[in-house]
Amino acid sequence: KNKPIFVSLTNSYHGETIGALSVGDVELYKDTYEPLLIQSIQTPVPKDMSLEAAKEAAQKFEELCKNRSDEISAIIVEPLIQAAGYMHMYHPHFLELLRDICDRYDVHLIADEVMAGFGRTGKLFACEHANITPDFLVLSKGITGGYLPLSVVLTSNDVYAKFYCDYLEYKAFLHSHSYTGNALACAAANATLDLFEKDDVITQNKAKAAYMMEKLKEFEKLDNVLEIRQTGMVSVVELKGYSSDERIGLKVHQYCLEREVLIRPLGHVVYFMPPYVITYEEIDKMMDTTLEAIKQL
């Protein structure tokens, strides 16, 4: 079938090459390249982490599929957390509903777990929180622990079989990349995965995430905090009462940097996404210093 259209969520970000920019929805990154981008459609992301918001957003996507599923090839989502989209989070049930809708309307589900994959959300993959399997799973970052660049796309045997053929049939993908299957990067990935198993990283992460959640409650008491939220080892403090011109996130960043704590706010959103090797003492310093910074505003 000729189904050229990709759907993504509002507020989404998937990278900065042409195809990835085309399905993103963060103006800061894509506006300059708008004339070059591939056609895509955005459907609403759940407005918050509630079950009701998940159902409302899924209904919007189903309405889109009812009208245009003959044109839609796939929907791409960042499971549970929209990282560059101000660390917006939503309920896992949204992924369950998407999986069901995609199955019924013959639309592929692509899960971009470049950020969330390999333990960041409390399970090895974020999709596991919804007990779903996407048609395509995009992975990077955590697969090598950040030591070497490597990305991977996993797909199903069904998709693989569609392109499996004798050479002269020309159904297979005939393109490749210069560094595909880089042996050193793959060795780093294997070593990282060995450590995940040996050190039981997922269990350790769950304990550290629970500790971070307790620390996060101190921020909720502040008058200039709009909301706190957390998924796994991603904790977020969203500030209120400041204009964009005040560059409030930069002020928090500078205060912390002077005290040997490196954080990277997104506008008025301050978040913690530490490496898994962080100690409890380092969590204390990271979050206590940031708390002091916000109190100083």
Task: Give the positions of each predicted feature.
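Conserved N-terminal phosphate-binding loop of PLP-dependent enzymes in the Aspartate aminotransferase
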Residues: K1-L297
